[in-house]
Amino acid sequence: HTTSAPPVLAGLSADVCLHGHLSAGTAAVECALEGIPTLLIDREGCPDSKFYELPEGKVIFKNWLDAIDALMEHFKAPQGIPGFGDWSEIIGEFDPFRDGKAANRIGTYLHWLIQGYEKGLNRDVIMADAAQRYSKNWGNDKVISINSV
């Protein structure tokens, strides 16, 4: 069954969210951004994933059995396990604004790109202009420059 409802909608009605992949963590990131305790199961074995900066055994698990065992311990503990499902160590790297306006920012950025192409500008000029405008509106620290060789 599929739905057009965002994953965070289900997350908001849950005590803890579980995400079964590291290869596609967007649903987990959405839930963690909302402050919902979110667990990750690394079924594929991706030790180089950014997610391994999160505490193993509290947020990231190598298999479902370990995650479910920890989840049961968390629910049995009167105050839960401290730091369980807590992404606060890295969540700011995924959305430094945390204001719910990411769609507006990316939409504006894409609009600037489209405007540049409609004007017939060179790709590099379009990209540089959009980056400069984004910097001016939302901060230079939010723009990453990757120079091609």
Residue ranges of model-derived segments:
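Catalytic binding pocket for nucleotide-activated donors in carbohydrate/polymer assembly enzymes
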Residues: 16, 21-98
